[in-house]
């Protein structure tokens, strides 16, 4: 069917018609026209298709007959039938088949004629292993993209592998990905170097270095030499290809460096903004070096070509020779040919002619022509960029001179720079003229004029391609005139280039659209091209004037105008299009105005910025997407680079007439090859396009380095500039160093600015490498800011110039928008966070609940209030976040950290809320609890924020503090695992997150093992404890922070401390680090301890925070149990008393806080402690039970001055030292007591708490107690608080007075407190109660209180008295442990009666309180044990010990809250009453025992023996020994004992307290941190856990459990009696329900929890974990108090990363463990026969076993009996058949039968040798088992194969001889029969059976074979000399196979 076949009449119509329609018909199938058409219709072209039915050529005499649409014919009566159904006549089955048409797409060859930036598809590999071959390398690279070519370089001399390879990818992305993923990776044992090497210059340099013997493949300098980073290298590499392209195209004129600056200014270079300017790498070739061509490239980048091409960089290396060629051939032609690229080409043509001339002249004319050529290049080119004429006119001379200079540039002659200065002036003038023809600078000296003339000529050439605008401008005055003017001005203003540049900028600003981009490039190039420009001289200015401003924003007329001196040029040169550049330009301009000297440096920074913006510009050629952005940046960058390079004028460049004699002085790096013509900065305007804008020659000025004085300035500036621009570009250190050093080199000899060097590069005039700015700067000569707008840079009238000015605007707008968006995001996020979390609502709710709980003592209420607090905390967090965000701390886009979520980005405000509004007395108490753990700085910030939000926030913060604590406690389990990790992740943000999360968990109720009620109690009490303990800490903090309301502050601080701890960590380096360590490494207390020792108070606070946190972690678990008790105790406490106490405490705390704020952190802590002491004293008076009163008296006896408080802090840190009973003085002596808490309040807290000041400790403890009193006191809690107080009061004493009462109460009161049964039960229950069972609230409260009190001083001290059968009452325990903030010892103690009175005792509670005791008094061994449990084994021990103690305490909340004695008085020698003495004795006993047992471990661990912990631990043994002599223990001694006995005591305590031992996780134990109020004891345990190896802890736990059980059993009666007494006393209190003993598990340390949590990174996460995580996530989302970060968290399904495949049991079967963990890495090793026997015996035993079961499993057949019957039947059948046929037939029958019914067999490891074949079903005798299958081969082949197999290392022989001629080879192919091993006593035999004339080997059973019995036969090898050992192990084994 031919369209032309249509009739003549139709042809006119049809050809088109047919063509289209028929084509459509062919393509889509013919659509029949429903109606036949006439020929007229055909003529009407209505037909869609036609067919030539009759062709006259085929049928003579006939006319053509067409059929249209299958129906109409061209002739009326054609006689041909129409088509019935019009359809596509083609055979569907043929034409529907799609044939892949693979048309080869021609690939552009990258050679010297390649125009435009070379795509960075070529990757150079270095340092490859010499075993890597092309195939391997290709396979390695294929994964990143299609590989077009792979070449490995070999030494031509010896063909040795040079370790260098070239890989050309099909795509830029593939090359980049390969470099990204393969660079600095280990391949075949070598760390390989991969970089983008666009033109292979780096590779060739490597090649030369290696072939010449300078380096070996492994010593080859790759990273630092070339480019510090592959990225930098990539940029140069990209630039290099471009350079080559440019240089080849442009000719030699585009030297890698010298022309590079301009070429970068040109579109090429600008596109290559990522590429370092020519100065960056002295030569473009030196891409690898820090100074990548990028540095020189900047100018070229300014031009559209340059930036893209990065040619300039290449040019540098290429030198004049390369340039001339390219210049002549490509650049000139391309430039002239491409009007659009006039800019680049203009410079190119300039360069081309120049290069041509230079090639010829350069050498001849070094002075003037070089100068002129540089000018022509820089100025001329710039003009060319602006007006082709100038570019062309100047260009020839410039190029000629420059080109030779380019070679010189390669030589790095500095003489050139001065010349280039002259030219620079000229070029500037030209550029300026183009920019503002109106202001051509007056002609300078004749030489200048000559230069100008030459420039004019060259530019004229370029003029044709040049931009008309530039041309017109240039035409306004003759090029010569303009050049002369420019030169004149430049000379006159050589040193005023900065100001001139400003004017230039102004001029360019007129042409800003072009000027911006070209100017950006050009300004620097002008500097480069002429030292004048660099020097901020008038001449430079005229040049700028000549140049049009291409930059988005008009370039500053003067350097001052430029935001950053030199930046304007860079920006403009870089690219007007780049908004960033534009933005930078204005800044640079301003800076330039401000600092002309800075111009050079600034320009360099601009270049850096450009590079930063587009780090890949050089690398990509920026053909990739990067290029587009980079090009603008590149332009500026190039400009900057050029500027830096400029200082090094190519020797060929004639120095600008004015000055820079020093040019020769500059030690130029190897001469920069003339920059590629496209380097004209003006070309930058269209940075993306490689071609420079037409008529825009490279800026000549760029080629001239500024005078030395300018360079020095540039040098310094370059540092800055590089910092900025390259910073964005990721300048490598080496890159910067080299750039600066080279610049410095140039500076020394040249007066040119760095930008001069760059412009020289652009002008291709720089014979020298651009010297690093530092070189010039090093000169110390301030360079006047080089004209930011190099004359070379200003493109002719490019529209892009206009864009450039807009770019600045756009950038500004973008910045504004970004700021607004940030603000909006901040606002919205904060609002959302606040709304979602509803902190305020939650806080209010919590406060309400808390008040209700206090009033009603209802755990639920306390829990509710706790929830409220949680909400408040959340709100507080939110407010803090908002505050910190508002402060602009880090909520930029980067600040927001959207990637990691808000909590990562938002510095979740420290929860150390400094809100000063105490909602109420209770809140005041809470505020007191605020941990002073925040660093002062953080506190200040927080306080400021808090103050801002003070009204709301303070309430919230209070609530938040409580809420946080509450949340934490419920989330304890999470906290233990996750909170720390959260904290570690982002202490600030994550803390709040944690709190929110915990709160949510609590709300969800999923996290807390305890009932919500218990949790609520525990939470509330814990929170209260936490609040109190942290409150104390926070009071200290608040004092520092000026927390007006101690209560609110404390509440907030408490909650915020946990979150703020993290924030503090972030805010304060030391504190942050320490806190982070504490949070993250609570178990690594010693770490923080070291830090803390340096900062006692800060660390103390941190310890508090940490302790609180950890305690919170544990508290949530523990306090869930203990909180109810606490709540009950608290509730028991009269609200009035509590409120009074709280108010007092709050007031004092506020005062203390004010003092603290005034004072240093340490002092404030002390003051707060004093106040706290007073408060505690008040509390003692208010709530002190006789016991507690005594204790308080003791405390009171010990004054608690500020110093004491300070000392108390120290003590808190010092509790580590363990001292015997007589050690009270030691306590008073400064002792470094490290809390054993996981956080290691003491250990971690830098400050060393000194036990010297018992008063201080007492005060602190007292204060804590008051705080606790302020909050509704659960019995255990109060007891804990009092115990803490007492402990604090007398850390060293056996028992503080309160401790004595506690002990007594423990012995008696505790019994009274807890019903005897309860006590007994509690002891047992506590022990029995696991962490799970044990009401978390009680222990928690203890923990919380302990945290609040002093972390170590936990209200929740385990209330188990050492001697008492019943757990020590919280009071006794509390008294026992001095309240040392951050020390495990400080636990508020309350008289058992007070704490426990009226409050039903839950075993967990008492248990929880028990942990408090361990702090100061070993008197309460059981309590310390609980404490220890909390510390060492927070969950188990704490619960155990606390259960007994805290049960007692909880069950009998003491009516009088015991103010914990000042923590500072842990060592007061307080003689306890008889009970107290007993407790003391017990403590002493425990202490001694623990000291002996644990002192080493404790001190070794670096954990201070926690008095509370230790004391609690001892209580059990003391309980037993209470009956024995009782000796007072010094608080410190007790602490030491406790600390030492953390493990041992914990054991003893647990023994003493069956409940604790039972595995009930003491809330105190749960929190590892002393900071946790309930963790006082726990804190001790935590340190122990942390300090003591897990095994030891476990052992200790076991021992403790045993001891506790023994002690419990021994003292059960006494305890029961005491419990009965207590029960009688507190019979009114509801008795805690008996909790069935739970399995006791050693509580995991936070570290362990975190390890488990983060194990997903190692072992992955499975579906189950993901399911529960998702459930938890959903629940959290459903909670009103959800964490803020949940808003930013989306649940995205992710496949499980831990897919557990059934474990292979081979190794378990006896195979060895691979030493290296990888079998492959160990090679082959033989399995010892003994090892084999292990599993072989198993197999044999299995085989020997009756096969019934196995048979049933393995054989689908019937049971064995039926199977046997079947076998028998088959045998009978065979026998019958055998009677009819011969043996052969029988065998054949067997064979066929085998095929019909195959035996079930399997192969597995054999005890005989390697693999064996085993029966999976019973096989009767004489049955065919399997055929030996393989390849039938002849003997000859078998011999050959045997040898080959041996060579291949195949040790086994699988050849089976069938007969004399045939052998079956099963080595490579076969079946399982090949695995049958030889045996001297086989159970099978082989038989050759002939089947269809083929011989087959069949294995028959020789006897009955059981299931799993190995099938063997006798190989019957012939006897040979070389024996093969037989391993069959049979009795009659022959020993050998042959």
Swiss-Prot record:
Residues 1-44, 226-357, 369-484, 496-630, 652-688, 916-1125, 1147-1174, 1187-1206, 1327-1373, 1413-1468, 1496-1528, 1744-1772 are annotated as: Disordered. Residues 1-20, 588-599, 1159-1174, 1329-1343 have a biased composition (Basic and acidic residues). InterPro entries: COMPASS_Set1_N-SET, Nucleotide-bd_a/b_plait_sf, Post-SET_dom, RBD_domain_sf, RRM_dom, Set1-like, Set1B_RRM, SET_dom. Signal peptide: none annotated. GO terms for cellular component: chromosome; cytoplasm; nuclear speck; nucleus; Set1C/COMPASS complex. It comes from the Eukaryota. A motif (RxxxRR motif) lies at residues 1770-1775. Belongs to the class V-like SAM-binding methyltransferase superfamily. Component of the SET1B/COMPASS complex. Histone methyltransferase that specifically methylates 'Lys-4' of histone H3, when part of the SET1 histone methyltransferase (HMT) complex, but not if the neighboring 'Lys-9' residue is already methylated. H3 'Lys-4' methylation represents a specific tag for epigenetic transcriptional activation. This is Histone-lysine N-methyltransferase SETD1B. The lineage of its organism: Eukaryota, Metazoa, Chordata, Craniata, Vertebrata. The gene is setd1b.
């Amino acid at each position: 069917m031919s369209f032309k076949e249509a009739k003549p009449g139709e042809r006119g119509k049809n050809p088109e018609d047919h063509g289209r329609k028929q084509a459509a018909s062919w393509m889509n199938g013919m659509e029949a026209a429903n109606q036949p058409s006439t020929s007229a219709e055909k003529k009407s072209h209505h037909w869609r298709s036609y067919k030539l039915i009759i062709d006259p050529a085929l049928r003579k005499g006939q006319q053509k007959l067409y059929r249209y649409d299958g129906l109409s014919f061209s002739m009326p009566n054609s006689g041909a039938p129409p088509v019935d159904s019009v359809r596509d006549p083609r055979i569907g089955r043929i034409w529907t088949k799609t044939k892949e048409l693979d048309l080869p797409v021609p690939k552009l060859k990258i050679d010297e004629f390649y125009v435009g930036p070379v795509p960075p598809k070529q990757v150079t590999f270095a340092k490859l292993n010499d075993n890597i071959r092309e195939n391997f390398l290709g396979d390695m690279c294929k994964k990143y993209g299609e590989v077009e070519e792979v070449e490995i370089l070999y030494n031509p001399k010896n063909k040795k592998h040079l370790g260098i390879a070239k890989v050309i990818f099909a795509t830029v992305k593939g090359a980049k990905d390969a470099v990204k993923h393969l660079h600095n990776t280990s391949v075949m044992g070598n760390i390989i170097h991969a970089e983008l090497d666009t033109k292979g210059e780096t590779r060739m340099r490597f090649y030369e270095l290696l072939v010449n013997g300078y380096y070996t493949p492994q010593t080859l300098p790759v990273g630092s030499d070339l480019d510090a980073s592959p990225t930098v290298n990539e940029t140069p590499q990209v630039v290099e290809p471009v350079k080559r392209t440019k240089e080849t195209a442009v000719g030699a004129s585009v030297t890698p460096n010298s022309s590079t600056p301009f070429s970068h200014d040109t579109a090429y270079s600008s596109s290559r903004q990522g590429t370092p300017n020519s100065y960056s790498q002295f030569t473009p070739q030196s891409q690898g070096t820090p100074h990548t061509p990028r540095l020189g490239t900047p100018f070229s980048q300014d031009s559209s070509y340059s930036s893209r091409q990065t040619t300039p960089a290449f040019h540098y290396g290429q030198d004049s020779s390369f340039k001339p060629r390219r210049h002549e051939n490509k650049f000139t032609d391309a430039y002239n040919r491409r009007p659009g690229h006039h800019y680049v080409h203009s410079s190119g043509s300039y360069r081309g002619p120049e290069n041509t001339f230079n090639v010829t002249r350069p050498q001849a004319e070094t002075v003037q022509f070089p100068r002129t050529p540089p000018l022509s290049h820089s100025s001329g080119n710039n003009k060319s960029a602006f007006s082709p004429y100038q570019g062309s006119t100047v260009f020839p001379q410039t190029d000629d001179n420059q080109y030779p200079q380019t070679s010189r540039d390669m030589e790095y002659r500095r003489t050139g720079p001065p010349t280039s200065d002259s030219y620079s002036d000229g070029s500037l003038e030209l550029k300026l003229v183009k920019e503002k023809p109106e202001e051509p600078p007056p002609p300078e000296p004749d030489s200048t004029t000559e230069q100008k003339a030459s420039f004019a000529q060259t530019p004229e050439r370029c003029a044709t391609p040049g931009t008309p605008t530039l041309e017109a401008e240039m035409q306004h005055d003759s090029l010569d005139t303009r050049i002369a003017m420019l030169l004149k001005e430049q000379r006159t203003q050589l040193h005023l280039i900065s100001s001139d540049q400003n004017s230039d900028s102004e001029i360019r600003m007129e042409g800003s659209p072009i000027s911006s981009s070209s100017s950006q490039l050009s300004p620097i190039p002008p500097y480069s091209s002429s030292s004048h420009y660099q020097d901020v001289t008038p001449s430079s200015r005229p040049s700028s004037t000549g140049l049009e401003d291409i930059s988005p924003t008009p370039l500053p007329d003067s350097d001052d105008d430029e935001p950053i001196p030199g930046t304007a040029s860079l920006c403009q040169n870089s690219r007007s299009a780049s908004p960033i550049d534009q933005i930078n330009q204005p800044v640079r301009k301003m800076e330039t105005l401000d600092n002309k000297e800075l111009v050079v440096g600034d320009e360099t920074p601009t270049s850096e910025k450009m590079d930063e913006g587009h780090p890949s510009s050089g690398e990509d050629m920026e053909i990739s997407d990067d290029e587009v952005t980079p090009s603008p940046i590149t332009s500026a960058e190039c400009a900057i680079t050029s500027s830096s390079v400029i200082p090094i004028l190519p020797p060929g460049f004639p120095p600008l007439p004015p000055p820079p004699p020093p040019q020769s002085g500059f030690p130029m790096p190897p001469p920069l090859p003339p920059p590629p013509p496209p380097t004209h900065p003006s070309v930058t305007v269209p940075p993306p396009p490689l071609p420079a804008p037409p008529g825009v020659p490279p800026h000549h000025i760029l080629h001239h380095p500024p005078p030395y004085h300018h360079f020095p300035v540039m040098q310094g500036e370059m540092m800055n500039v590089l910092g900025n621009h390259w910073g964005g570009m990721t300048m490598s250190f080496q890159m910067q160093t080299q750039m600066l050093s080279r610049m410095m080199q140039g500076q020394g000899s040249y007066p040119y600015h760095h930008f001069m060097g760059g412009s020289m590069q652009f002008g291709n005039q720089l014979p020298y490498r651009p010297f690093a700015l530092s070189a010039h700067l090093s000169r110390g000569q301030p360079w006047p800011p080089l004209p930011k707008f190099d004359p070379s840079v200003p493109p002719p009238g490019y529209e892009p110039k206009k864009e450039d000015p807009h770019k600045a605007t756009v950038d500004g707008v973008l910045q504004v928008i970004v700021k607004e968006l940030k603000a909006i995001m901040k606002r919205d996020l904060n609002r959302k966070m606040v709304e979602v979390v509803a902190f305020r609502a939650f806080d209010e709710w919590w406060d309400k609940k808390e008040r209700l709980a206090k009033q009603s003592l209802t755990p639920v209420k306390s829990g509710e209030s706790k929830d409220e607090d949680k909400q408040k905390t959340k709100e507080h967090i939110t407010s803090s976040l908002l505050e910190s965000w508002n402060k602009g701390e880090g909520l930029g886009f980067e600040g927001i950290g959207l990637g990691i979520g808000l909590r990562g980005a938002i510095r979740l405000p420290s929860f150390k809320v400094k809100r000063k509004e105490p909602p109420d007395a209770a809140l005041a108490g809470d505020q007191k609890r605020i941990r002073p753990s925040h660093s002062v700085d953080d506190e200040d910030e927080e306080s400021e924020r808090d103050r801002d939000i003070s009204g709301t926030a303070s309430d919230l913060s209070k609530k938040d503090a409580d809420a946080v604590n509450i949340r934490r406690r419920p989330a304890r389990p999470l906290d233990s695992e996750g909170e720390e990790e959260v904290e570690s992740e982002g202490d600030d943000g994550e803390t709040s997150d944690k709190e929110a999360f915990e709160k949510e968990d609590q709300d969800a109720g999923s996290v807390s093992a305890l009932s919500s009620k218990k949790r609520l109690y525990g939470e509330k009490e814990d929170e209260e404890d936490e609040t109190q303990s942290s409150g104390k800490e926070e009071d200290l903090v608040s004092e520092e922070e000026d927390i007006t309301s101690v209560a609110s502050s404390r509440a907030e601080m408490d909650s915020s401390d946990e979150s703020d701890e993290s924030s503090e960590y972030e805010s304060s380096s030391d504190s942050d680090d320490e806190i982070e360590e504490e949070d993250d490494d609570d178990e690594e207390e010693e770490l923080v301890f070291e830090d803390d020792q340096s900062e006692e108070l800060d660390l103390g606070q941190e310890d508090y925070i940490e302790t609180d946190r950890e305690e919170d972690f544990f508290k949530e678990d523990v306090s869930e149990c203990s909180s109810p008790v606490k709540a009950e105790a608290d509730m028991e406490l009269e609200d009035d008393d509590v409120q009074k106490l709280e108010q007092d405490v709050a007031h004092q705390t506020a005062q203390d806080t004010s003092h603290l704020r005034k004072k240093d952190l340490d002092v404030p802590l002390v003051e707060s402690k004093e106040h706290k002491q007073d408060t505690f004293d008040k509390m003692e008076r208010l709530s002190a039970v006789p016991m507690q009163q005594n204790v308080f008296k003791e405390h009171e006896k010990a004054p608690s001055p500020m110093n004491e408080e300070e000392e108390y802090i120290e003590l808190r840190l010092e509790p580590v030292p363990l001292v015997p009973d007589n050690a009270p003085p030691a306590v008073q002596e400064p002792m470094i007591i490290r809390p054993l808490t996981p956080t290691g309040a003491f250990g971690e807290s830098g400050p060393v708490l000194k036990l010297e000041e018992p008063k201080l400790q007492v005060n602190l403890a007292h204060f804590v107690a008051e705080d606790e009193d302020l909050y509704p006191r659960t019995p255990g809690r109060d007891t804990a608080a009092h115990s803490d107080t007492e402990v604090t009061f007398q850390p060293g004493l056996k028992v503080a007075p309160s401790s004595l009462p506690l002990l007594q109460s423990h012995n008696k009161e505790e019994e009274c407190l807890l019903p005897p049964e309860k006590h007994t039960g509690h002891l047992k229950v506590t022990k029995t109660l696991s962490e799970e069972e044990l009401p978390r609230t009680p222990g928690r409260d203890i923990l919380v209180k302990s945290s609040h009190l002093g972390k170590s001083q936990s209200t929740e001290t385990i209330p188990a008295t050492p001697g008492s059968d019943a757990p020590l009452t919280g009071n006794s325990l509390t008294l026992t442990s001095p309240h040392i903030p951050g020390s495990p010892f400080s636990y508020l103690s309350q008289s058992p009666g007070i704490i426990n009175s009226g409050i039903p005792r839950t075993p967990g509670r008492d248990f929880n309180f028990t942990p408090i005791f361990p702090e100061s008094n070993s008197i309460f061994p059981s309590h310390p044990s609980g404490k220890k449990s909390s510390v060492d084994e927070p969950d188990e021990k704490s619960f155990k010990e606390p259960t007994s103690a805290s049960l007692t305490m909880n069950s009998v909340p003491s009516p009088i809250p015991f103010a914990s004695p000042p923590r500072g008085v842990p060592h007061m020698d307080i003689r306890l009453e008889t009970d107290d003495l007993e407790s003391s004795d017990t403590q002493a006993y425990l202490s001694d025992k623990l000291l002996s047992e644990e002192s080493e471990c404790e001190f070794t661990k670096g954990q201070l023996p926690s008095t509370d912990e230790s004391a609690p631990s001892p209580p059990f043994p003391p309980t037993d020994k209470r009956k024995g002599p009782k000796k007072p223990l010094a608080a410190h001694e007790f602490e030491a004992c406790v600390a030492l006995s953390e493990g041992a005591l914990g054991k003893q305590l647990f023994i003493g307290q069956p409940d604790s031992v039972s595995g009930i996780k003491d809330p105190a134990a749960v929190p590892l941190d002393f900071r946790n109020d309930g963790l006082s004891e726990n804190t001790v345990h935590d340190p122990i856990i942390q300090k003591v190896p897990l095994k030891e802890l476990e052992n200790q736990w076991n021992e403790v459990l045993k001891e506790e059980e023994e002690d419990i059993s021994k003292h059960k009666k006494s305890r029961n009696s005491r419990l009965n007494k207590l029960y009688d006393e507190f019979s009114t209190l509801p008795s805690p329900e008996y909790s069935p003993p739970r399995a006791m598990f050693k509580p995991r340390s936070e570290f362990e929890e975190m390890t488990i949590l983060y194990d997903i990174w190692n072992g992955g996460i499975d579906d189950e974990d993901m399911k529960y995580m998702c459930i938890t996530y959903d629940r959290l989302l459903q909670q009103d108090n959800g964490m803020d970060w949940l808003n930013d968290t989306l649940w995205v399904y992710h496949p499980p990363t831990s897919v557990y495949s059934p474990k292979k049991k081979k190794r378990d079967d006896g195979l060895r463990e691979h030493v290296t963990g990888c079998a492959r890495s160990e090679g082959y090793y033989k399995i010892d026969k003994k090892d084999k026997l292990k599993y072989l015996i198993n197999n044999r035993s299995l085989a020997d076993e009756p096969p019934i079961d196995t048979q049933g499993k393995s054989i689908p057949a019937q049971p064995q009996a039926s199977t046997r019957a079947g076998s028998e039947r088959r045998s009978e059948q065979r026998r019958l058949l055998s009677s009819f046929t011969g043996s052969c037939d029988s065998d054949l029958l067997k064979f066929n039968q085998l095929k019909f019914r195959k035996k079930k067999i399997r192969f597995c490891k054999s005890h005989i040798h390697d693999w064996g074949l085993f029966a999976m079903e019973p096989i009767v005798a004489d049955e065919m088992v399997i055929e030996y299958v393989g390849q039938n081969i002849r003997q000859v082949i078998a011999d050959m194969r045997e040898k080959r197999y041996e060579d291949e290392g195949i040790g086994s022989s699988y050849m089976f001889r069938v007969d004399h001629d045939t052998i079956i080879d099963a080595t490579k192919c076969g079946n399982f029969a090949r695995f049958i091993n030889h045996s001297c006593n086989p159970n099978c035999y082989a038989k050759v059976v002939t089947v269809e004339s083929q011989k087959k080997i069949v294995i028959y059973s020789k006897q009955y074979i059981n299931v799993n019995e190995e099938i063997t036969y006798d190989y019957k090898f012939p006897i040979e000399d070389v024996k093969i050992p037989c391993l069959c192990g049979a009795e009659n084994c022959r020993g050998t196979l042959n």
